[in-house]
């Protein structure tokens, strides 16, 4: 059996090693949690704040008629959708959801990710189309000639 004088340093070194191992474990777990949190933030893209995303979701809900008509008008070909299509407000909400919020929000409307991508592509195409189309010429105002006479002045 070990003497009393050798058991103290042995006990002290055992406690010191236990402390170091537990500290290392806590640091590793804390760093792992930070990395996991960062990964979750990048999955969400993080640029949109909660209120913007919430408002975009509400806008999407109010656009369901337009979205349903859009998908019903698609026949799997390159034919244009029904006249009117999806308006700028709905396209703005779709763009915000795809780029800055959770694209999973489309599932709240019963849409798949592929359908969400189709909506995004349509809205991007409409935005490009409106940028490329020339703006209408301003209307000119045609005035009829008026004869002005001044009393007392004869020419």
UniProtKB/Swiss-Prot annotation:
Matching Pfam families, A to Z? Prolamin_like (PF05617)
Query: Which InterPro entries does the protein's record reference?
Result: EC11-15 (IPR044711), Prolamin-like (IPR008502)
Cellular localisation: Cytoplasmic vesicle; Secreted
Q: Which Gene Ontology cellular-component terms appear in the entry?
A: cytoplasmic vesicle; extracellular region; vesicle
Q: In which tissues is it expressed?
A: Restricted to female reproductive tissues, specifically accumulating in storage vesicles of the unfertilized egg cell.
Asked whether the keyword Signal is assigned, the reply is yes
Q: Which keywords appear in this protein's UniProt record, sorted alphabetically?
A: Cytoplasmic vesicle, Fertilization, Secreted, Signal
Q: Where is the signal peptide?
A: 1-32
Entry keyword Cytoplasm:
no
Q: Which domain of life is it from?
A: Eukaryota
Example GO biological process: double fertilization forming a zygote and endosperm
Give the main location: cytoplasm
Family stated for the protein in its record: Belongs to the plant egg cell-secreted peptide family.
Q: What does this protein do?
A: Involved in the regulation of gamete interactions during the double fertilization and to prevent multiple-pollen tube attraction; mediates the redistribution of the gamete fusogen HAP2/GCS1 to the cell surface after secretion upon sperm arrival.
**PANTHER family membership:** EGG CELL-SECRETED PROTEIN 1.5
Question: Can you name this protein?
Answer: Egg cell-secreted protein 1.5
């Amino acid at each position: 059996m070990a003497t009393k004088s050798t058991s103290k340093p042995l006990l002290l070194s055992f406690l010191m090693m236990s402390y170091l191992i537990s500290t290392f474990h806590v640091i590793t777990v804390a760093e792992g949690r930070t990395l996991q949190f960062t990964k979750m933030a990048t999955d969400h893209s993080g640029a949109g704040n909660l209120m913007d995303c919430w408002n975009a979701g509400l806008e999407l809900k109010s656009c369901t008629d337009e979205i349903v008509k859009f998908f019903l008008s698609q026949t799997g070909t390159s034919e244009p959708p029904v006249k009117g299509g999806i308006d700028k407000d709905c396209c703005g909400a779709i763009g915000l959801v795809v780029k800055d919020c959770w694209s999973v929000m489309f599932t709240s409307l019963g849409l798949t990710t592929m359908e969400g991508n189709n909506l995004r592509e349509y809205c991007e195409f409409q935005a490009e189309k409106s940028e490329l189309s020339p703006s209408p010429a301003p209307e000119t105002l045609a005035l009829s000639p008026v004869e002005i006479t001044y009393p007392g002045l004869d020419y």
